[in-house]
From Swiss-Prot:
It catalyses: (2R)-3-phosphoglycerate + ATP = (2R)-3-phospho-glyceroyl phosphate + ADP. This is Phosphoglycerate kinase. Belongs to the phosphoglycerate kinase family. Its main location: cytoplasm. It comes from Leuconostoc mesenteroides subsp. mesenteroides (strain ATCC 8293 / DSM 20343 / BCRC 11652 / CCM 1803 / JCM 6124 / NCDO 523 / NBRC 100496 / NCIMB 8023 / NCTC 12954 / NRRL B-1118 / 37Y). Pathway: Carbohydrate degradation; glycolysis; pyruvate from D-glyceraldehyde 3-phosphate: step 2/5. The lineage of its organism: Bacteria, Bacillati, Bacillota, Bacilli, Lactobacillales.
């Protein structure tokens, strides 16, 4: 990788500004899942072990009013980080000003400080100004001035956004480096796109064609096979003229689905049967229906069926690179999670056979965690939108702003 990384920096005695992604689920001050905090630990520990003084920036949720600030302080996140590091994390409930500046100047080597939620800058005195999320140049410059001309970006999850806390700071320091997590994401996702070991199979699931259409188009040019599942598959079924009952589909995307199928030929792999249910409920009456026979009126497809699972297993059997983003069914209901879980199990086999397996997106990640196989796959991406855009081959502002070696 030709980008500057944290290992290239001289950190001792330096105030090191770091952008991390601590946008964790939080309710009433209780963190639902701390995976993103854990993911940033190697870079933070490296800075501290090398006698750097770590100053952490992250956003949390969306701030649209002063009231949102009461619910979305990073204070509980700083406390959890302290537990994970086994050391005190100084938390400053400000995003600028004297209190923040003096706390940073008082930091000693090997100490860590967390700045308040960067998106507090999106609402100032009750007015929505979006200083952080619209990358206000004055704010990026100010935050950059708080450190010693060093910046580490370890927040891949926000790399597709140009914010003051990633691009803004990076543009105002002489050395902007990738943290270990960012470096890993760039390596695995970058290799999958630029130089995959073949056969390369992409699996794209989820509800809407409109959300994933660009990635499907892009991957059809790069992968040997593209498997499409989840709710979006019914738009393709409708395009084939199959009956889809009450299944989710996008009428305005049917023509596009026809075009894609015509262009892709047998490169595009679609489900051949479904688990259809008479209600959107885990205890609904269900039946297995072949796609060609169609889903009866009053029923909706909520998962791929057993023949589709077998088809996907066969498609993946000799794969050497697999990228998976999005569920095959309504994964949050146990009766419609089988297709998604079967993919997770198949990916373990691919990895055991020497293949590279990359998983991105919340539901796919949840599936491999539920199966307990996350550590048996090559890479679990921390970015949803960011990983999709990177796989599409787009330049991500958060990565583009990291210095070249």
């Amino acid at each position: 990788m030709a980008k500057l990384t944290v290992s290239d920096l001289e950190l001792s005695g330096k105030k090191v500004l770091m952008r991390v992604d601590f946008n964790v689920p939080i309710k009433a001050g209780v963190i639902g899942n701390d995976n993103r905090i854990v993911a940033a630990l190697p870079t933070i520990k490296y800075v501290l072990e090398n006698n750097g003084r770590a100053i952490l920036f992250s956003h949390l949720g969306r701030i649209k009013s002063e009231d949102d600030k009461k619910e979305l302080s990073l204070a509980p996140v700083a406390a959890r980080l302290g537990e994970l590091l086994g050391k005190d994390v100084k938390f400053v409930p400000q995003t600028r000003g004297e209190e923040l500046e003096s706390a940073i100047n008082a930091l000693q080597d090997g100490e860590v400080l967390m700045v308040e939620n960067t998106r507090f800058e999106d609402v100032v005195d009750g007015e929505v100004v979006k200083n952080e999320s619209k990358n206000n140049p004055e704010l990026g410059k100010y935050w950059a001035s708080l450190g010693d001309d060093l910046f580490i970006n370890d927040a891949f999850g926000t790399a597709h956004r140009a914010h003051a806390s990633n691009v803004g700071i990076a543009s105002n320091v002489s050395q902007a480096a990738a943290g270990f997590l960012m470096e890993k994401e760039i390596k695995f996702l970058g290799d999958a796109v630029a130089n995959p070991v073949r056969p390369f199979v992409a699996i794209i699931g989820g509800a809407k064609v409109s959300d994933k259409i660009e990635i499907v188009k892009s991957l059809l040019n790069k992968a040997d096979k593209v498997i499409v599942g989840g709710g979006m598959a019914y738009t393709f079924d409708a395009a084939k003229g199959n009956k889809i009952g009450n299944s989710l589909f996008e009428a305005d995307k049917v023509e596009l689905a026809k075009e894609l199928m015509a262009e892709a030929g047998d490169k595009l792999v679609l489900p051949i049967d479904s688990i259809a249910a008479d209600a959107f409920s885990n205890d609904a009456k269900t039946e297995v229906v072949d796609a060609e026979d169609g889903i009866p009126d009053g029923y909706m497809g909520l998962d791929i069926g057993p023949k589709s699972v077998k088809l996907l297993q066969d498609t993946l059997s000799d794969a050497k690179t697999v990228v998976w983003n999005g569920p095959m069914g309504v994964f949050e209901m146990s009766n419609f999670a089988k297709g998604t879980l079967a993919i997770g199990e198949e990916l373990v086999k691919v990895t055991e056979n020497g293949g590279t397996t990359i998983v991105g997106g919340g539901d796919s990640t949840a599936a491999v965690q539920q199966l307990g196989v996350a550590d048996k796959l090559t890479h679990i991406s921390t970015g949803g939108g960011a990983s999709l855009e990177y796989l599409e081959g787009k330049e991500l502002p958060g990565i583009a702003s990291i210095s070249e070696k």
